[in-house]
A protein has these predicted regions:
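A glycine-rich phosphate-binding loop feature that marks nucleotide/adenosyl-phosphate handling sites
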Residues: 152-155, 233-236, 290-301, 339-350, ...
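Short, compositionally biased low-complexity segments
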Residues: 66-73, 103-112, 206, 241-253, ...
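Short, hydrophobic beta-strand segments
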Residues: 114-119, 307-310, 356-361
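Gly/Gly-Pro- and Ser/Thr-rich, intrinsically disordered tail segments characteristic of DNA damage-repair
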Residues: 1-236, 282, 365-410
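DNA-contacting surface of Y-family translesion DNA polymerases
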Residues: 188, 196-339
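Short, charged/polar surface micro-motifs in flexible loops or helix N-caps
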Residues: 12-14, 42-45, 301-304, 349-352
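Acidic, metal-coordinating catalytic segment for phosphate/diphosphate chemistry
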Residues: 314-410
Length: 410
């Protein structure tokens, strides 16, 4: 069987790099070379940090912290507003360059993708050399840097790309696991979040090597059977998942937005929920799907997510129906504390042709559906910004509920 060769390409501090590249092209100072960040309002000292430069990181500025706190750490911090249209253009551009080199490319988030380079040895006999070619082509043509990780599977390639940054190429082949992977803290392993890392550390499983050497039966008692199997495989560098050129079957649709200013009232939250429902319902209709379950997610200043979900009486793709459900659900579990993130996810999908009973009176539902159709047609002709129902917050996470290594690394 032919040995696999997988690359993982990850944009370095994507949001900030893309804004910096635009400014450099216009003859302005490079944000990457000074203490700078994306997000929030400097004058009002509101919002949160979405991305930061390496010089800002040296002052202790962290992604996700309030702008006011970041400015106290670094008074000279240069703040730039987010521009998601710019991010989308740059994302498409760097993926297009990757496709010039690889027969199979799987984009897993706005700023990262996997390349299956298996069988390309006649074209590219030296994997390191072609990885540098890809990295250098992206920088020379688009003006921003990436890291490239190289291995025999997606997991190890992803872990390799997270080694020293920026503008680096790293390998992590199976023979290198004891030296490069196992000494890392267990929290650095893909799929190990903060809570799980704390649990493992409390059980004296402090490094990835400790995890690889842990008895599977003990690990099952600690984390559960399925999680234990996944963790043990990942710690040993085992990941058979393929690089998929075509998207996996979508199991749910979701959008969430990190807010520039905290939401503190129900009307503010409802405006955001309307924009999110409008966006995600349009994607649902475009794919000819309907949903039976809606989930609302919130995050406060403690950075902990809370979610509640509700089943709909019948499958729906109508924006107003989904918005009404989201409003009601939000009102049930929000405790009034300021919010920094809101999200809406639609799941339990059915074919769009599935017969629906009427949630609204027929006439009301027909009007709502015709409104959706008119809005979809206008956006299809003039672009997504042609019409909006309420203010549209920029989505920081657009979910299709398939496997992705992690959310974008801003």
């Amino acid at each position: 069987m032919q040995q696999r060769l997988i690359f993982h390409v990850d944009v370095n501090s994507a949001f900030l790099s893309w804004e910096a590249a635009r400014r450099v092209a216009a003859g302005e100072p490079d944000l990457r070379a000074i203490p700078s960040a994306i997000g929030g309002d400097r004058d009002k000292r509101t919002g949160i940090i979405l991305a930061k430069s390496i010089p800002a990181k040296k002052f202790g500025v962290t992604t996700g912290e309030p702008v006011g706190m970041a400015l106290r750490k670094c008074p000279q911090l240069v703040l730039a507003p987010p521009d998601f249209a710019l991010y989308t253009r740059n994302s498409r551009a760097f993926i297009a360059i990757c496709r010039r080199f690889a027969p199979v490319v799987e984009q897993v988030s706005i700023d990262e993708c996997f390349l299956d380079m298996t069988g390309t040895h006649l074209l590219y006999p030296d994997p390191l050399a072609v990885a540098h070619q890809i990295k250098d082509a992206i920088f020379s043509e688009l003006g921003f840097t990436v890291n490239v990780g190289i291995s025999e599977n997606k997991l190890l390639a992803k872990m390799a790309s997270d080694f020293e940054k920026p503008d680096k190429v790293h390998t992590l082949f199976p023979a290198e696991i004891p030296q490069k992977l196992w000494p890392l803290p267990v929290g650095d392993l893909l799929s190990v979040g903060r809570a799980l890392a704390e649990k493992l550390t409390a059980a004296r499983i402090r490094t990835i090597g400790d995890l690889a050497r842990t008895d599977l039966a003990y690990l099952q008692k600690l984390t559960g059977v399925r999680t234990a199997a996944l963790l043990h495989n990942y710690a040993c560098g085992v990941d058979p998942s393929p690089v998929l050129a075509e998207p996996e079957a979508v199991k749910c649709y979701g959008n969430s937005t990190t807010l520039e200013q905290d939401v503190t009232t129900v009307p503010q939250a409802n405006q955001v929920l309307l924009a999110l429902c409008d966006s995600v319902a349009a994607r649902l209709r475009a794919d000819g799907r309907r949903c039976l379950c809606l989930t609302v997610t919130i995050r406060g200043s403690d950075f902990k997510n809370r979610s509640h979900q509700r089943r709909l009486p019948e499958p729906s793709d109508v924006t107003q129906e989904l918005y009404d459900c989201a409003k009601s659900l939000f009102a049930e579990f929000w405790d009034g504390r300021p919010l920094r993130l809101l999200g809406v996810t639609l799941s339990d999908l059915t074919d769009g042709q599935t017969q629906q009973l009427s949630l609204f009176p027929d006439e009301k539902r027909d009007r709502a559906r015709k409104l959706d159709q008119a809005v979809d047609q206008l956006r299809g002709k003039f672009g997504p910004a042609a019409i909006s129902r309420g203010p549209r917050p920029p989505p920081t996470h657009r979910l299709h509920c398939k496997f992705t290594p992690k959310p974008p690394d801003p």
